[in-house]
Amino acid sequence: MNMKRIFQKIIVVLLAAVLWILPIQSVQAAGMSYSKASQLYTEAQCRWIAHPRKVKITDDLRARSGWFGNDTGKKVDLHRPFCSDMSHWIWTDLSGDGVPEYLAVIPGGQLIILTIYKNKVKVLAVLQTTSIMPDVYYNRQNNTFTIAASITARLTSRNVYKIQKGKLYRLATLSDAIGQMNGYGYVPVNRYLNGKLVSKSKYNRYYKKYCKNMQIINWKGAQE
Protein backbone atom coordinates (compact mmCIF):
# COMPACT_ATOMS: atom_id res chain seq x y z
CA MET A 1 0.00 0.00 0.00
CA ASN A 2 1.53 3.35 -1.06
CA MET A 3 1.69 6.44 1.13
CA LYS A 4 -1.15 8.24 -0.64
CA ARG A 5 -3.56 5.34 -0.15
CA ILE A 6 -2.62 5.04 3.51
CA PHE A 7 -3.34 8.75 4.12
CA GLN A 8 -6.67 8.45 2.30
CA LYS A 9 -7.61 5.42 4.43
CA ILE A 10 -6.83 7.28 7.65
CA ILE A 11 -8.95 10.27 6.65
CA VAL A 12 -11.87 8.10 5.53
CA VAL A 13 -11.78 6.06 8.74
CA LEU A 14 -11.79 9.12 10.98
CA LEU A 15 -14.49 10.92 9.00
CA ALA A 16 -16.64 7.81 9.18
CA ALA A 17 -16.14 7.70 12.93
CA VAL A 18 -17.13 11.36 13.27
CA LEU A 19 -20.26 10.95 11.16
CA TRP A 20 -21.20 7.86 13.17
CA ILE A 21 -20.92 9.53 16.57
CA LEU A 22 -22.01 13.13 15.86
CA PRO A 23 -25.76 12.45 16.00
CA ILE A 24 -25.25 11.13 19.54
CA GLN A 25 -22.76 13.65 20.93
CA SER A 26 -22.01 16.74 18.89
CA VAL A 27 -20.41 18.93 21.56
CA GLN A 28 -18.26 17.91 24.50
CA ALA A 29 -18.59 19.18 28.03
CA ALA A 30 -14.86 19.90 28.08
CA GLY A 31 -15.28 22.38 25.23
CA MET A 32 -13.61 20.35 22.46
CA SER A 33 -15.76 19.59 19.43
CA TYR A 34 -15.60 16.18 17.84
CA SER A 35 -14.33 17.77 14.64
CA LYS A 36 -11.39 19.22 16.61
CA ALA A 37 -10.70 15.83 18.18
CA SER A 38 -10.86 14.23 14.73
CA GLN A 39 -8.33 16.75 13.46
CA LEU A 40 -5.90 16.02 16.30
CA TYR A 41 -6.16 12.25 15.86
CA THR A 42 -5.76 12.54 12.09
CA GLU A 43 -2.68 14.75 12.38
CA ALA A 44 -1.06 12.41 14.91
CA GLN A 45 -1.72 9.29 12.87
CA CYS A 46 -0.46 10.89 9.67
CA ARG A 47 2.76 11.84 11.48
CA TRP A 48 3.23 8.25 12.62
CA ILE A 49 2.78 7.02 9.05
CA ALA A 50 5.10 9.62 7.53
CA HIS A 51 7.67 8.92 10.25
CA PRO A 52 7.12 5.27 11.31
CA ARG A 53 7.38 4.78 15.03
CA LYS A 54 7.94 1.60 17.02
CA VAL A 55 6.27 1.24 20.41
CA LYS A 56 6.38 -1.49 23.03
CA ILE A 57 3.39 -3.67 23.82
CA THR A 58 2.39 -2.47 27.27
CA ASP A 59 0.30 -5.49 28.24
CA ASP A 60 -0.62 -8.92 26.91
CA LEU A 61 -4.24 -9.82 27.63
CA ARG A 62 -3.39 -13.53 27.49
CA ALA A 63 -0.74 -13.27 30.18
CA ARG A 64 -3.05 -11.27 32.46
CA SER A 65 -5.09 -14.45 32.92
CA GLY A 66 -2.09 -16.66 33.54
CA TRP A 67 -2.28 -18.21 30.06
CA PHE A 68 0.69 -19.02 27.86
CA GLY A 69 2.18 -16.35 25.62
CA ASN A 70 3.42 -12.96 26.72
CA ASP A 71 4.53 -10.38 24.17
CA THR A 72 4.75 -7.54 26.67
CA GLY A 73 7.73 -5.37 25.76
CA LYS A 74 7.83 -6.49 22.13
CA LYS A 75 8.15 -3.58 19.67
CA VAL A 76 5.46 -3.13 17.01
CA ASP A 77 4.52 -0.50 14.42
CA LEU A 78 2.27 2.12 15.99
CA HIS A 79 0.37 2.95 12.81
CA ARG A 80 -0.52 -0.58 11.71
CA PRO A 81 -3.70 -1.18 13.78
CA PHE A 82 -5.49 1.86 12.34
CA CYS A 83 -4.49 1.72 8.65
CA SER A 84 -4.92 -1.96 7.80
CA ASP A 85 -7.76 -3.24 5.63
CA MET A 86 -8.66 -5.40 8.64
CA SER A 87 -8.75 -2.49 11.10
CA HIS A 88 -11.66 -1.99 13.47
CA TRP A 89 -12.10 1.10 15.61
CA ILE A 90 -14.10 2.67 18.41
CA TRP A 91 -14.53 6.41 18.80
CA THR A 92 -16.22 7.39 22.05
CA ASP A 93 -15.68 8.93 25.47
CA LEU A 94 -14.48 6.26 27.89
CA SER A 95 -13.49 8.52 30.79
CA GLY A 96 -16.54 10.73 31.26
CA ASP A 97 -14.66 13.97 30.56
CA GLY A 98 -16.35 14.62 27.21
CA VAL A 99 -13.20 13.95 25.19
CA PRO A 100 -13.50 10.96 22.84
CA GLU A 101 -10.95 8.18 23.04
CA TYR A 102 -9.86 6.34 19.91
CA LEU A 103 -9.33 2.57 19.94
CA ALA A 104 -8.08 0.60 16.95
CA VAL A 105 -7.42 -3.12 16.63
CA ILE A 106 -6.49 -5.80 14.13
CA PRO A 107 -7.90 -9.25 14.93
CA GLY A 108 -5.10 -11.33 16.42
CA GLY A 109 -2.85 -8.29 16.64
CA GLN A 110 -2.55 -5.23 18.83
CA LEU A 111 -5.18 -2.93 20.28
CA ILE A 112 -4.13 0.73 20.50
CA ILE A 113 -5.81 3.10 22.97
CA LEU A 114 -5.42 6.83 22.27
CA THR A 115 -6.72 9.84 24.18
CA ILE A 116 -6.39 13.60 24.00
CA TYR A 117 -4.93 15.34 27.02
CA LYS A 118 -4.04 19.03 27.09
CA ASN A 119 -4.74 19.21 23.34
CA LYS A 120 -2.20 16.49 22.56
CA VAL A 121 -2.77 12.92 21.42
CA LYS A 122 -1.38 10.38 23.87
CA VAL A 123 -0.85 6.67 23.45
CA LEU A 124 -2.38 5.18 26.59
CA ALA A 125 -1.76 1.52 25.85
CA VAL A 126 -0.69 -1.01 23.25
CA LEU A 127 -2.38 -4.31 24.13
CA GLN A 128 -1.72 -7.71 22.60
CA THR A 129 -5.04 -9.39 21.88
CA THR A 130 -6.08 -12.92 20.95
CA SER A 131 -7.30 -14.46 17.69
CA ILE A 132 -10.87 -13.50 18.66
CA MET A 133 -11.97 -9.86 18.49
CA PRO A 134 -12.15 -8.37 22.01
CA ASP A 135 -15.34 -6.75 23.26
CA VAL A 136 -15.31 -3.28 24.83
CA TYR A 137 -17.81 -2.20 27.48
CA TYR A 138 -18.38 1.12 29.24
CA ASN A 139 -19.74 1.63 32.75
CA ARG A 140 -21.24 5.11 33.10
CA GLN A 141 -21.71 4.77 36.85
CA ASN A 142 -17.98 4.80 37.60
CA ASN A 143 -16.53 5.86 34.23
CA THR A 144 -14.59 2.65 33.75
CA PHE A 145 -14.34 0.50 30.66
CA THR A 146 -13.71 -3.20 30.27
CA ILE A 147 -11.93 -5.09 27.52
CA ALA A 148 -13.18 -8.68 27.45
CA ALA A 149 -10.97 -11.16 25.62
CA SER A 150 -11.66 -14.81 24.88
CA ILE A 151 -8.35 -16.44 25.70
CA THR A 152 -9.64 -19.92 24.83
CA ALA A 153 -13.07 -21.42 24.25
CA ARG A 154 -13.29 -21.96 28.03
CA LEU A 155 -11.39 -18.96 29.40
CA THR A 156 -12.57 -15.34 29.31
CA SER A 157 -10.61 -12.39 30.67
CA ARG A 158 -12.19 -9.05 31.59
CA ASN A 159 -9.69 -6.24 32.06
CA VAL A 160 -11.10 -3.17 33.79
CA TYR A 161 -9.52 0.23 33.10
CA LYS A 162 -9.95 3.85 34.10
CA ILE A 163 -8.55 6.97 32.42
CA GLN A 164 -7.57 9.92 34.61
CA LYS A 165 -5.54 12.99 33.67
CA GLY A 166 -4.13 11.47 30.53
CA LYS A 167 -3.12 8.16 32.13
CA LEU A 168 -4.56 4.66 31.96
CA TYR A 169 -4.99 2.63 35.12
CA ARG A 170 -5.87 -1.06 35.21
CA LEU A 171 -8.18 -1.63 38.17
CA ALA A 172 -8.72 -5.38 37.93
CA THR A 173 -8.57 -8.45 35.73
CA LEU A 174 -11.50 -10.83 36.19
CA SER A 175 -11.14 -14.23 34.55
CA ASP A 176 -13.36 -17.28 34.60
CA ALA A 177 -12.36 -20.71 33.33
CA ILE A 178 -14.96 -23.39 32.62
CA GLY A 179 -13.72 -26.89 33.40
CA GLN A 180 -14.69 -30.30 32.07
CA MET A 181 -18.00 -31.85 33.08
CA ASN A 182 -17.55 -34.69 35.55
CA GLY A 183 -19.44 -37.96 35.71
CA TYR A 184 -22.22 -36.38 37.75
CA GLY A 185 -22.93 -33.66 35.20
CA TYR A 186 -21.22 -30.94 37.24
CA VAL A 187 -19.24 -28.32 35.32
CA PRO A 188 -16.68 -26.56 37.54
CA VAL A 189 -15.94 -22.87 37.08
CA ASN A 190 -12.71 -21.41 38.42
CA ARG A 191 -12.64 -17.68 39.04
CA TYR A 192 -9.52 -15.53 39.08
CA LEU A 193 -8.80 -11.99 40.23
CA ASN A 194 -5.59 -10.53 38.79
CA GLY A 195 -4.41 -14.03 37.92
CA LYS A 196 -5.05 -15.53 41.37
CA LEU A 197 -7.75 -18.09 42.15
CA VAL A 198 -10.44 -16.53 44.38
CA SER A 199 -13.79 -17.49 45.85
CA LYS A 200 -17.02 -16.97 43.93
CA SER A 201 -18.17 -14.34 46.45
CA LYS A 202 -15.00 -12.26 46.09
CA TYR A 203 -15.12 -12.52 42.32
CA ASN A 204 -18.76 -11.45 42.29
CA ARG A 205 -18.03 -8.38 44.43
CA TYR A 206 -15.63 -7.07 41.80
CA TYR A 207 -17.86 -8.17 38.94
CA LYS A 208 -20.85 -6.34 40.44
CA LYS A 209 -18.80 -3.18 40.96
CA TYR A 210 -17.30 -2.94 37.48
CA CYS A 211 -19.21 -5.20 35.10
CA LYS A 212 -22.85 -5.44 36.17
CA ASN A 213 -23.98 -2.13 34.65
CA MET A 214 -21.64 -1.94 31.69
CA GLN A 215 -22.85 -1.57 28.11
CA ILE A 216 -21.14 -2.92 25.03
CA ILE A 217 -19.62 -0.54 22.48
CA ASN A 218 -19.69 -1.85 18.93
CA TRP A 219 -16.59 -1.86 16.76
CA LYS A 220 -16.72 -0.22 13.34
CA GLY A 221 -14.78 -1.93 10.56
CA ALA A 222 -12.74 -0.73 7.59
CA GLN A 223 -14.60 -3.28 5.46
CA GLU A 224 -18.04 -1.91 6.31
Language model regions located:
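Sec-dependent N-terminal signal peptides of Gram-positive bacterial secreted proteins and lipoproteins
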Residues: M3-V27
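Calcium-binding motifs, dominated by EF-hand helix-loop-helix domains
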Residues: I90-L94
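Short, surface-exposed coil-to-beta transition loops
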Residues: V99, P107-L111, T129-M133, T152-R158
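Repeated scaffold domains used in trafficking and secretory/extracellular systems
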Residues: S131-Y138, Q180-G183
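Acidic/hydrophobic-patterned starts of short beta strands in beta-sheet-rich repeat architectures
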Residues: S95-V105, Q141-A148
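Acidic, small-residue rich beta-repeat scaffolds with periodic aromatic anchors
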Residues: L19-I24, A29-D60, T144-E224
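Blade-edge motifs of beta-propeller repeat domains
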Residues: A30-C83, V121-M133
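Beta-propeller blade repeat segments, especially FG-GAP/WD-type strand-to-loop junctions
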Residues: L111-A125, Y161-K165
